[in-house]
């Protein structure tokens, strides 16, 4: 057997490199929701500090954040609605967000499905007045008529087609004549769902009619002034970072002191 050094038994190096906590290189930023939500302080997000050519604001822009409407509007009954917010601008330590979508939680959608009824779904692409292309998804369920004895409430195919056509008409009418801010204002109290329920009474009575999902397919060219309007104006957003201009004639040279 050859005599040699056993590599497995060799001693390791005495000076090991000390592990650096990665959180020492990171910073926390506040997330601000648009003004159409009651609670504008959504939370915080973390990012690596600006270093060299890498800017922290560039890493933050484009982040998609998901928040429950119960936290945004301080209403626990709306916990099943999830709103997506996209970071479009960074001012100081504040991330200014804009609406980027909405969806229902899976447990809420599953709780709506029942036996002995018909499920009717529809989706349509609409364009707001300020250039956003949105895909709106609606859902509804048939219910019993007044004094109905029959257990089932199945709708015929012709009735389902007629109800879906009414859904298209209501979504187009309520969405195409408003901008994104007005659209979200209609989305939160479920204005379109109630309109669909009213307009389809003559075809077949519906219940649990909701706009359960909204996707942003296309956004207009980014305008920072419009984003500031969604956050209460530029002077409100960056109040802590903007100084006051000194007018000419206000500065007075201090009187020199005799002793220090």
Swiss-Prot record:
<dbReference type="InterPro" id="IPR001593">
    <property type="entry name" value="Ribosomal_eS1"/>
</dbReference>
<keyword id="KW-0007">Acetylation</keyword>
<dbReference type="GO" id="GO:0003735">
    <property type="term" value="F:structural constituent of ribosome"/>
</dbReference>
<dbReference type="InterPro" id="IPR027500">
    <property type="entry name" value="Ribosomal_eS1_euk"/>
</dbReference>
<comment type="subunit">
    <text>Component of the small ribosomal subunit. Mature ribosomes consist of a small (40S) and a large (60S) subunit. The 40S subunit contains about 33 different proteins and 1 molecule of RNA (18S). The 60S subunit contains about 49 different proteins and 3 molecules of RNA (25S, 5.8S and 5S).</text>
</comment>
<keyword id="KW-0687">Ribonucleoprotein</keyword>
<protein>
    <recommendedName>
        <fullName>Small ribosomal subunit protein eS1</fullName>
    </recommendedName>
</protein>
<keyword id="KW-0963">Cytoplasm</keyword>
<feature type="modified residue" description="N-acetylalanine; partial">
    <location>
        <position position="2"/>
    </location>
</feature>
<keyword id="KW-0689">Ribosomal protein</keyword>
<dbReference type="GO" id="GO:0022627">
    <property type="term" value="C:cytosolic small ribosomal subunit"/>
</dbReference>
<dbReference type="GO" id="GO:0006412">
    <property type="term" value="P:translation"/>
</dbReference>
<dbReference type="InterPro" id="IPR018281">
    <property type="entry name" value="Ribosomal_eS1_CS"/>
</dbReference>
<dbReference type="Pfam" id="PF01015">
    <property type="entry name" value="Ribosomal_S3Ae"/>
</dbReference>
<comment type="similarity">
    <text>Belongs to the eukaryotic ribosomal protein eS1 family.</text>
</comment>
């Amino acid at each position: 057997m050859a005599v040699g050094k056993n590599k497995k038994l060799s001693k390791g190096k005495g000076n090991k490199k000390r592990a650096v906590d990665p959180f020492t290189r990171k910073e926390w930023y506040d997330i601000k929701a648009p003004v159409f939500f009651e609670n504008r302080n959504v939370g915080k997000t973390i990012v690596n500090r600006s270093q060299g050519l890498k800017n922290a604001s560039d890493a933050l822009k484009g982040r998609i954040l998901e928040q429950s409407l119960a936290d945004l509007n301080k209403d626990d009954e709306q916990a099943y609605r999830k709103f997506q917010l996209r970071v479009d601008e960074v001012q100081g330590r504040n991330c200014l967000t804009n609406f980027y979508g909405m969806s229902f939680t899976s447990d809420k959608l599953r709780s709506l499905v029942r036996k002995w009824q018909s499920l009717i779904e529809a989706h349509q692409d609409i364009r707001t007045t300020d250039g956003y292309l949105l895909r709106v998804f609606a859902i509804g369920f048939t219910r019993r008529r007044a004094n109905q004895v029959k257990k089932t409430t199945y709708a015929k195919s012709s009735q389902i087609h007629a109800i879906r056509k009414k859904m298209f008409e209501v979504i187009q009418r309520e969405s195409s004549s408003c901008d994104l801010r007005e659209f979200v204002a209609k989305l939160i109290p479920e204005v379109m769902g109630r309109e669909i329920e009213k307009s389809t009474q003559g075809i077949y009575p519906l219940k649990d009619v909701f706009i359960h999902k909204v996707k942003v397919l296309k956004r207009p060219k980014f305008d920072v002034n419009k984003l500031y309007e969604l956050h209460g104006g530029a002077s409100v957003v960056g109040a802590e970072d903007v100084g006051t201009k000194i007018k000419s004639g206000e500065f007075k040279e201090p009187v020199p002191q005799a002793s220090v």
